[in-house]
Every structure is written in structure tokens, then in C-alpha cells.
Amino acid sequence: MRRFLAISSAIACALVGLSACGDDGGAESDADPKIIKVRFEDGKVTPNGERIDVEQGQEVQFIVAADEPGEIHVHSEPEQELEYDEGEEIFKLEFDKAGVVEVESHDLEQVIVQLEVS
């Protein structure tokens, strides 16, 4: 009986030790980057207010094509401003807090996308 208890205790300790090596639940994501194409042309922007699901820690790539320079405002913590020139640029961001992040053009007074971070 003592031998059984000793073996059971050793197995229980080993399992507890192994579970401590698991995922810490951080904000990293193994998901592929979320690609969002943003086009500014003739005073208009697309997309226009779409809601897009994003995982915490997932890379989000904004591919911005514009016919003139401008700025995108990202209402995250901390807030971010993405300045772009005429032509095409790529901006890579990650969000580690759950919630809705609005991405907008202040010049056009328009929400481009709402990122649903979960």
C-alpha cells in the first residue's frame, strides 16, 4: 500500500509540474495576419464602417492605397496615427486588449473599420 501511495504521489507531482509549463494565456496569436485593404480615392474611402473580427495578438496589416497623403486614426490604447503618402503603404499593428477598436479618417469624418478584438 505504501508503494502505491508513493507512486501515486510521484505521478500527481509530475502532472502538476507539467501543467505549469503550459500556455500562459498571453496575447500572442498563431493566426495568419488579418489583411485589410483601405483605398482612398476622390475624397472617399473603402471599406466604410465594416466590423472585422481579430484575435488578441493577431497581426493586422492595413494595405493603404491613396491618391493623396493623409492620416488614419486608430482608437486603441495607446491611440495611433498612421500617416500615409500618395501610393501604397503597409502598416502592421497588433492589439492585446479585447474590445472594439475604431479605425477612422478624421479628414473625411468617417469610420473605415471597427475591429472586434477577442
Q: Language-model features: where?
A:
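Bacterial N-terminal signal peptides that target proteins for export
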Residues: 1-8
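C-terminal motif of bacterial Sec signal peptides marking the signal peptidase cleavage site
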Residues: 17-20
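Extracellular/periplasmic metallocenter environments
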Residues: 23-25, 85-118
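N-terminal edge beta-strand
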Residues: 30-56
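Beta-strand cores of secreted/periplasmic/IMS beta-sandwich domains, seen most often
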Residues: 50-68, 90-97, 101-104
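A short beta-strand motif characteristic of beta-propeller blades
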Residues: 80-82
